Structure formats: structure tokens, C-alpha cells
Regions:
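Sec-dependent N-terminal signal peptides
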Residues: 4-14
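Sec/Tat signal peptide C-region and signal peptidase I cleavage site
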Residues: 16-20
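Short, well-ordered beta-strand elements
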Residues: 22-31, 53-58, 81-82
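Short, polar/charged alpha-helical segment
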Residues: 33-54
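Pocket-flanking alpha-helical
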Residues: 36, 40, 61-101
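Conserved small/polar residues in nucleotide/adenosyl-binding loops
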Residues: 107-109
């Protein structure tokens, strides 16, 4: 869970648009019952700390469909603020220069 959370947060600051408060659009595939309940914990924590979570769920494929959607958004120049990413895929995105630096001290782990 920790690695998945870190991957999710890795894109948290990639948006170049300015905003008044902490607001993130999160692309993810946690849509089934237990997954959605786990994600709700993250959403609620973010909201409790003054953030606004914009949900972008992508169903199906165990994350494969979400990865296709993420690639399309990046290519179009419109990446989400954060994305759930599997394992070493985050390294591939980093090598392409599309991962913004993040600060683990901002994450309550």
C-alpha cells in the first residue's frame, strides 16, 4: 500500500495551472467495493487537510485501462495532478521527464 500511495502522490504536483488551494485530479482504478473504500480513506484525509480531490476513476483491466488513459493525457499535454501507478512504471515516466519532484514529508505515512 505504501509504494502504491507514493506512486499515486508522485504526480501530485505535475499540474502547471495555478489554483487558490490544494486541489488535485486523481486518475485511478480503485473502483470496486473494497478498493473504493480504501481510496475513500485517502480522499477523506486530503479533504480534512483542506484539499479538494477531483476523482477520475478508470474501470477495467486491473489498471491497464487507467495506464492507457494516463498516457493519452500526458501526450495531450493534460496530465492529471496525481495517478495510481503500478510498480516500476513510475521509473519509466520519470525517465521521460513527466514526473514532478515530490516531498515525502508532505505525505502522512
Amino acid at each position: 500500500m505504501r509504494k502504491l500511495l507514493i506512486a499515486l502522490i508522485a504526480f501530485a504536483f505535475t499540474s502547471t495551472s495555478s489554483y487558490a488551494g490544494p486541489k488535485i485530479e486523481v486518475l485511478h482504478w480503485w473502483t470496486s467495493g473494497g478498493e473504493a473504500a480504501a481510496l475513500k480513506v485517502l480522499k477523506d484525509d486530503f479533504a480534512a487537510n483542506g484539499g479538494e480531490w477531483l476523482d477520475m476513476p478508470v474501470t477495467g483491466g486491473g489498471g491497464d485501462a487507467a495506464n492507457v488513459a494516463l498516457k493519452a493525457r500526458i501526450v495531450a499535454g493534460d496530465p492529471p495532478s496525481a495517478s495510481q501507478i503500478k510498480g516500476p512504471t513510475i521509473q519509466e515516466y520519470d525517465q521521460e521527464g513527466v514526473v514532478a519532484p515530490y516531498n515525502l514529508s508532505l505525505i502522512h505515512i
